[in-house]
Amino acid sequence: MDLDLASILKGEISKKKKELANSKGVQPPCTEKFQPHESANIDETPRQVEQESTDEENLSDNQSDDIRTTISKLENRPERIQEAIAQDKTISVIIDPSQIGSTEGKPLLSMKCNLYIHEILSRWKASLEAYHPELFLDTKKALFPLLLQLRRNQLAPDLLISLATVLYHLQQPKEINLAVQSYMKLSIGNVAWPIGVTSVGIHARSAHSKIQGGRNAANIMIDERTRLWITSIKRLITFEEWYTSNHDSLA
């Protein structure tokens, strides 16, 4: 099923125009927010749905002027979504360990994690006949809240550090075991830093250790959404291990 942006936008623009008309009379403008279609099309157009959901954060509908601005944004949203998707293609997915824990590098690191997860999912989708097709869609759906947080640069710093560390080791040849070790730290609530990488300074680690304080609750127990995306990261690690071993044997 393709994402029918045209019909979504047509309905939303019509709603906003009615709100604008009502705001000129006695009735106050409606404050109901448009809910993004987060999961209906996740298998077909995940990045497009992500960008649509992210775009919704910037739409305001509290006053008449805001409604006019919202209508304008809704009308040109497809173009802005396509521009954002095109921009994604210019970003390298290679994670630089020196960026892990850096405040300045956090937005870029978040996007790298987002795009690398998409890359792994693309490889899995291309391998569905050979590798666990029954797990694929559920894994993508479970990862969707994480992908949104990464695109919006809203993932908690300690979770981002641990996730980026897992993905960094996953990108390195023959470091699956280090990725698994880092994943275990992520699961139990410890901050996982790249193992054996001196470019991640002791000062960055110390600063984040102080921010984290004594909290050591298992991340997997924070809430159901967090539990699901963390367990889905383990599925990505397992898939990459299978994918690498199968392609190495064919080389």
UniProtKB/Swiss-Prot annotation:
Q: Which domain of life is it from?
A: Eukaryota
Region called Disordered, residue ranges:
17-67
- Keywords, ordered alphabetically: mRNA processing, mRNA splicing, Nucleus, Spliceosome
Primary residence? nucleus
Q: Which cysteines are joined by disulfide bonds?
A: none
Spell out the subcellular localization from the entry.
Nucleus
Q: Name one GO biological process term.
A: generation of catalytic spliceosome for second transesterification step
One GO CC annotation: U4/U6 x U5 tri-snRNP complex
Briefly state the protein's biological role: Component of the U4/U5/U6 snRNP, binding principally to the u5 snRNP. It is not absolutely required for the second step of pre-mRNA splicing at low temperatures but is required at higher temperatures. It may stabilize a particular conformation of the U5 snRNP or orient the U5 snRNP within the U4/U5/U6 snRNP or within the spliceosome.
Q: Give the family, as the similarity comment puts it.
A: Belongs to the PRP18 family.
**Which proteins does it associate with, and in what oligomeric form?**
Homodimer. Component of the U4/U6-U5 tri-snRNP complex composed of the U4, U6 and U5 snRNAs and at least PRP3, PRP4, PRP6, PRP8, PRP18, PRP31, PRP38, SNU13, SNU23, SNU66, SNU114, SPP381, SMB1, SMD1, SMD2, SMD3, SMX2, SMX3, LSM2, LSM3, LSM4, LSM5, LSM6, LSM7, LSM8, BRR2 and DIB1.
Q: What is the name attached to this protein's record?
A: Pre-mRNA-splicing factor 18
